[in-house]
Amino acid sequence: MGNFHATTIFAVHHNGECAMAGDGQVTMGNAVVMKHTARKVRKLFQGKVLAGFAGSVADAFTLFEMFEGKLEEYNGNLQRAAVEMAKQWRGDKMLRQLEAMLIVMDKTTMLLVSGTGEVIEPDDGILAIGSGGNYALSAGRALKQYASEHLTAKQIAKASLNIAGDICVYTNHNIIVEEL
């Protein structure tokens, strides 16, 4: 049986609000859609942190668990938890094999965390990952720049995922949006 992949997460900080959206598609290999309603965006740490994953589903659950443990260990300090998780992820021979990326955010900070040790904070308050990530990122930047007065963070997140779903075959329109 092939690898299961789950893709396209978009996150935005906008006008004091924050939202993260993920589509529901899980694809086995490059040919078969196995699930349409997966939940790839979650609230963690008593609802104060959002986390979303793109990549292998089983690997992502391992990383969610590991990140939540780091949040508890560092009392909700998002940046410290992300850095410590990235160090552990990169430094452990078994964890290095995990194929997933995470976006984590709270009301003030948003970070991309990867297994190669990157912990990246965007300049513009927008991040997107997964197969439709570039489409969602482009749409989100345009919406934030040109329609920001008229849209909420949640609306930007949902619209960006919808546009990605129109273009990317690995992204569907079963969109879940979480806000803080």
From Swiss-Prot:
<dbReference type="Pfam" id="PF00227">
    <property type="entry name" value="Proteasome"/>
</dbReference>
<keyword id="KW-0378">Hydrolase</keyword>
<feature type="binding site">
    <location>
        <position position="165"/>
    </location>
    <ligand>
        <name>Na(+)</name>
    </ligand>
</feature>
<dbReference type="GO" id="GO:0009376">
    <property type="term" value="C:HslUV protease complex"/>
</dbReference>
<keyword id="KW-0888">Threonine protease</keyword>
<comment type="similarity">
    <text>Belongs to the peptidase T1B family. HslV subfamily.</text>
</comment>
<dbReference type="InterPro" id="IPR023333">
    <property type="entry name" value="Proteasome_suB-type"/>
</dbReference>
<comment type="subunit">
    <text>A double ring-shaped homohexamer of HslV is capped on each side by a ring-shaped HslU homohexamer. The assembly of the HslU/HslV complex is dependent on binding of ATP.</text>
</comment>
<feature type="binding site">
    <location>
        <position position="171"/>
    </location>
    <ligand>
        <name>Na(+)</name>
    </ligand>
</feature>
<keyword id="KW-0915">Sodium</keyword>
<dbReference type="GO" id="GO:0004298">
    <property type="term" value="F:threonine-type endopeptidase activity"/>
</dbReference>
<dbReference type="GO" id="GO:0046872">
    <property type="term" value="F:metal ion binding"/>
</dbReference>
<keyword id="KW-0021">Allosteric enzyme</keyword>
<keyword id="KW-0963">Cytoplasm</keyword>
<dbReference type="InterPro" id="IPR001353">
    <property type="entry name" value="Proteasome_sua/b"/>
</dbReference>
<keyword id="KW-0479">Metal-binding</keyword>
<keyword id="KW-0645">Protease</keyword>
<dbReference type="GO" id="GO:0051603">
    <property type="term" value="P:proteolysis involved in protein catabolic process"/>
</dbReference>
<protein>
    <recommendedName>
        <fullName>ATP-dependent protease subunit HslV</fullName>
        <ecNumber>3.4.25.2</ecNumber>
    </recommendedName>
</protein>
<dbReference type="GO" id="GO:0005839">
    <property type="term" value="C:proteasome core complex"/>
</dbReference>
<feature type="active site">
    <location>
        <position position="7"/>
    </location>
</feature>
<dbReference type="InterPro" id="IPR029055">
    <property type="entry name" value="Ntn_hydrolases_N"/>
</dbReference>
<feature type="binding site">
    <location>
        <position position="168"/>
    </location>
    <ligand>
        <name>Na(+)</name>
    </ligand>
</feature>
<comment type="function">
    <text>Protease subunit of a proteasome-like degradation complex believed to be a general protein degrading machinery.</text>
</comment>
<dbReference type="InterPro" id="IPR022281">
    <property type="entry name" value="ATP-dep_Prtase_HsIV_su"/>
</dbReference>
